[in-house]
Amino acid sequence: MRRNNYLLLLGLLLASCVAPDTQHHIVVSTREQKLAVLDRGTLMATYPVSTSKFGLGDYLRSSRTPLGQLEVAKKIGDNAPLGAVFKDRVRTGEIVAPNSPGRDPIVTRILWLRGREAQNANAFGRYIYIHGTPEERLIGMPASYGCIRMRSTDIVQLYNIVGVGAAVTIVEAPLISAIPGLASGHSMSPANTAPFVMR
């Protein structure tokens, strides 16, 4: 029993020593309903998403998507199958197929976000996630209750790329305005770490 407690304590200690992901940056455009992921300023991929149908903001119980600078605080769902249902961040054992009628649970993976500014300070306590949804037919239009929804296959890819601590920027502007260098077709170099434009 003591050995198990020791191993558990050692595991928790090592997990807390993992360096935050400073290599990746997620940028979400609520205007375009798109998400871009960058690796040291180089665009890796873009995905269609769905943000809140109630608009933007971070008021408690508002069901709105917060704007500004956030970070990935926790990752939940390692190795879960596509469509695996989560309730209170715990797998239920149920699998839901895309576009199942009458179903709208959180599925596949969860990236739990923490706000880094006053304008999004409630995000973590409001359980704002980037997560999979079975309502894939609604991806590309505002349909969520505050979270950022993705197709299950897309959230698995994103989940495998980013780590805890990865920066997340949510803007109203188009991605081309929010990411320096994207308009010219050039990625932002590691030396050019200009902040993302927030409009």
Task: Please describe what each predicted stretch is.
Residues 25, 46-48, 69, 127, ...:
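Well-ordered beta-strand positions in beta-sheet-rich domains
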Residues 18-20:
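Bacterial signal peptide processing site
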Residues 59-64, 80-199:
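Exported/periplasmic cell-wall-interacting domains
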Residues 23-48:
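Post-signal peptide N-terminal segment of mature Sec-exported envelope proteins
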